[in-house]
Amino acid sequence: GKLDKNEINTFINLLIEARDQDRQIFIMGNGGSAATASHYCCDFNKGASYGYDKRFKFICLNDNVAGMMAYANDVSYDDVFVEQLKNFYQNGDIVIGISGSGNSKNVINAVEYAKSQGCKVIGITIGLTGFDGGKLRQMAKYSVNMNIDDMQISEDLHMMLDHLSMKVITNNMISETLAKAE
């Protein structure tokens, strides 16, 4: 597989834009992708925000286990993310779906909802996928596809993208701070 540098640069620039415009960034996944989504939330809300005036507003939709299980039990597991988005999504927010296969129904449903709420025009949907990207890659306005036919390596690459993005953004913020001080 090959990583597309333009997809990665676009991803990083969209995160910076969301931070600068005080937008929320919703992120979600299942299984290993859920752990990755939670890790992104931690890294950006603390690691790329603490001590800076401009702060990220990541919200991990798979971290509220009680809420997810209530929707899974009473509505459908396919709707555990979309129902949470209905409470919080605002035009201009970013929705990041992480799915190794690109075909996780509950992630797809959340991205479809975001697009139906104007995300296609104003907001952004980003799909982090593996293999051929599945349905998520086709429907997301932006995607970063880890084109490799191995779930664990795909998940590892999603985590590497987290750390790479965070380091690029924090290094830029340090450079900006130093330039202002001169």
Report residues per predicted region.
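A short, small-residue-rich loop immediately preceding and capping a beta-strand
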Residues: 24-28, 91-102
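Glycine-rich, small/polar surface segments that engage phosphate groups of diverse ligands
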Residues: 17-89
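A charged, well-structured terminal subsegment
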Residues: 87-88, 151-182
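Short glycine/serine/threonine-rich phosphate/pyrophosphate-binding segments
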Residues: 33-38, 103-110
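A short, well-structured juxtamembrane/interface segment
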Residues: 1-21
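Short, glycine/polar-rich helix-capping loops at beta-to-alpha or helix-loop-helix junctions
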Residues: 123-140
